Design a protein with these regions (language model features):
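Acidic, Ser/Thr-rich intrinsically disordered and amphipathic helical segments
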Residues: 75, 84, 88, 99, ...
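FAD-binding FR-type
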Residues: 266-363, 379, 385, 389-393, ...
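Non-transmembrane, juxtamembrane loop and terminal tail segments
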Residues: 2-31, 234-262, 468, 473-478, ...
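Membrane-proximal cytosolic interface modules of multi-pass membrane proteins
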Residues: 166, 173-176, 185, 189-199, ...
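Membrane-embedded alpha-helical bundles of multi-pass integral membrane proteins
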Residues: 15, 19-226, 231
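Classical protein tyrosine phosphatase
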Residues: 81-82, 110-131, 211, 216, ...
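Extended, low-complexity, polar regulatory segments
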Residues: 1-37, 304, 528, 541-569
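Reductase modules of NAD(P)H-dependent flavoproteins
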Residues: 111, 307, 312-316, 321-323, ...
Length: 640
């Protein structure tokens, strides 16, 4: 098992557990404006780093300076100005996709972007203090207006502050979320204006602090464009498909999927990636001069890049419109453009995550499109299990790194509609079939895989303030045309087959408007299921039926398969929302070594999982003499 065994590593594990509990701690979200908007707070670890930076900046700005002495106000103005200028390199370093901080800290540029925004806000605060002390000094002589109108240095400094204020305000999440494309464009334009204004404002002897961030930006761009040229120029790659351009490497096909989702497929890509990474995708023929980050939903062994992109607005909406218009299934007259594909450009891959193969247990939780991140992680471990079972991976020193120490995987996917099951229907069935084959090949196979899919009609997928009584619909399998209703009572599992076309009174019917399927009203789709092993069945189809696909139905049962528990042979489908604390606790109770908890989804789900991990780490006294092993948490956030 993946656990420390020596005194040194036990001590290190204890310190790590304490730091993890502190850094992952967070408070409950704040709901304002009659529950129409929710403010999600960051975890304590990043907040402490930002506070430490702020305190350091303030101490350096006011060191040995008396703010009550009117004759020191000018000195404070100079001091805060120089300290503000010295912050520019850090801000630009945190903004680049290729930077040494991310390399040394093992963090992706997406994780550092949060620090970039708060470092910029610290810069704004320092610049504001710098300006206010100069204004305060001039106000004694009623000289502020005169300086702003007549002094060129003051004009340039005030212009730089105004531009910085605009950048900080437009970078607030509600504003930048209005339009990704507009935000990126105005951010680049205002950045150039800010740098020019600062360069004109500061003395010549300190302009080096302006040239440093410019150099960092140039390095980032040169590195990105050089790597992008190697990745996208066909001269460096051989396109095995023979369908690509003679100049460019990548050609993509666009297919519309249920729930306004576009599947983008690039055969034989010119990059190498790991599970959980993402790339920036550009298609100038559909969305010109735009580059959007998308998670890679496939593995390198698939020999293709696959993306599932939800149509929101802007570029993603145009991608779905193009796919729908040119798809043959939708009745398009001229489908040649879709079959021929479009030239696309790929930048990346980006993203860092510890290999989950080194952990004893792994809990993967996804909300909606978050499965594009967790599904490749599941498939990556399961593929190693399969190769080990077949004897394709040896035990030599050169092969050891390819082995997986993972003994059990718990996969949870929360979706708003049964139609979304089609996104990863094939992958789920393949993984479950491979694990079942491993168990048939080796009756005492020690690895465990449990998959649960929660269908909820809650648009936000946010957990309620207090857990409700556990109620839900449980089905087994991925095809809704022939569902199995399961009642789970402790260790006994009873399966009742129900045809989706049956006219039985127990058949699920849509809930009336204003009423729910629960006795007291409300809908079971929004009920939080505390324990899957204690479920009372109820009928609810507010999420709509899934589309059956005869090509990927589970294979018929055989005599050998009867010995395999149903839960391990097909996913458990429930109507409701998960209770992460119970799910994670059950895995930790079985773990013999360090466990990994990975979540990707809406902020509500991520916050709930984060609080659950902190609570369980404290409850179980991880690495504090109880024998409970460590918990590694990785939160992959949505948005930008």
């Amino acid at each position: 098992p993946a656990k420390p065994k020596s005194l040194f590593f036990n001590t290190y594990a204890t310190l790590t557990a304490i730091v993890r509990e502190i850094s992952n701690a967070t408070i409950h979200p704040l709901t304002i404006f009659n529950s129409t908007y929710t403010i999600h707070f960051p975890s304590l670890g990043p907040v402490l780093i930002i506070l430490a930076n702020l305190i350091t900046i303030l101490v350096l700005s006011f060191y040995k300076l008396d703010t009550t002495d009117v004759w020191k106000w000018e000195d404070i103005g100079y001091s805060t100005g120089f300290i503000a200028l010295c912050q520019l390199p850090l801000i630009f370093l945190l903004a680049g996709r290729q930077n040494i901080i991310g390399f040394l800290a093992g963090m992706s540029y997406a994780d550092l972007n949060w620090f970039h925004r708060w470092a910029a806000r610290t810069l704004w605060l320092t610049a504001t203090i710098h300006m206010c002390f100069w204004f305060r000094d001039w106000a004694r002589y009623d000289y502020i207006k005169y300086e702003l109108y007549n002094d060129e240095l003051t004009k340039r400094g005030f212009a730089a502050w105004c531009i910085l204020t605009f950048i900080v305000v437009t970078s607030i999440r509600p504003i930048r979320g209005l339009s990704y494309e507009v935000f990126v464009l105005q951010h680049l334009v205002t950045f150039i204006g800010f740098i020019v204004a600062v360069w004109m404002h500061v003395p010549d002897e300190v302009k080096i602090w302006v040239w440093i961030p410019i150099g960092l930006l140039v390095f980032d761009r040169v590195a990105r464009y050089t790597w992008g040229a190697y990745t996208n120029l066909a001269v460096f790659h051989r396109n095995k498909s023979g369908k690509g351009s003679r100049v460019w490497t990548h050609s993509a096909t666009f297919t519309p999927m249920p729930s306004n989702i576009t599947r983008v497929t690039i055969e034989n890509p010119g990059i190498h990636w790991k599970a959980g990474q993402h790339v920036f995708l550009t298609c100038h023929s559909i969305i010109p001069f735009q580059s959007h980050p998308f998670t890679i939903a496939s593995l390198p062994e698939d020999e293709k890049l696959e993306f599932f992109i939800r149509a929101e607005k802007g570029g993603t909406k145009r991608l779905f419109r193009y796919a729908s218009k040119n798809d043959k299934v939708l009745g398009a007259v001229d489908s040649a453009p879709a079959s021929r594909g479009r030239t696309v450009f790929v930048e990346g891959p980006y993203g860092t995550l510890r290999s989950l193969r080194q952990f004893d247990s792994a809990v993967l939780l996804a909300g909606g499109m978050g499965a594009t991140f967790t599904m490749p992680l599941l498939r990556d471990i399961a593929s190693v299990w399969t190769k080990e079972s077949k004897g394709e991976i040896g035990q030599g020193s050169f092969q050891a790194k390819r082995l997986a120490a993972t003994q059990r995987i718990r996969f949870v996917w929360v979706i708003k509609s049964r139609a979304q099951l089609s996104l990863f229907e094939t992958q789920l069935h393949s993984v479950l079939a491979d694990v079942a084959e491993c168990r048939r090949r080796q009756p005492d196979y020690p690895r465990e895989l449990e998959v649960s899919i929660y269908i909820t009609c809650d648009e936000k997928l946010d957990p309620p303030a207090l857990p409700s009584p556990a109620q839900g619909v449980v089905t087994s399998g991925l095809d809704s045309s022939y569902e199995k209703e399961i009642s789970v009572e402790k260790d006994n599992i009873s399966i009742h087959s129900i045809s989706a076309n049956s006219s039985s009174t127990s058949e699920a019917v849509p809930a009336p408007v204003g009423k729910g399927c629960l006795p007291g009203g409300g809908c079971c789709c929004t009920t939080q299921i505390e324990d899957e092993d204690q479920i009372n069945t109820c009928a609810c189809t507010c999420s709509g039926p899934a589309q059956a696909n005869a090509d990927i139905l589970p294979p018929p049962s055989t005599s050998d398969e009867k010995t395999i528990p149903p839960r391990e042979f097909s996913p458990t489908i429930l109507s409701g929302r998960p209770y992460p604390r119970t799910i994670i606790r059950k895995v930790l109770e079985k773990a013999e070594g360090e466990s990994a908890v990975v979540v990707c989804g809406p902020p509500g789900l991520s916050d709930d999982v984060r609080r659950s991990v902190v609570y369980l780490s404290d409850e179980r006294a991880v690495h504090k003499g109880t024998g409970a092993q460590g918990i590694y948490l990785h939160v992959e956030n949505f948005g930008y």
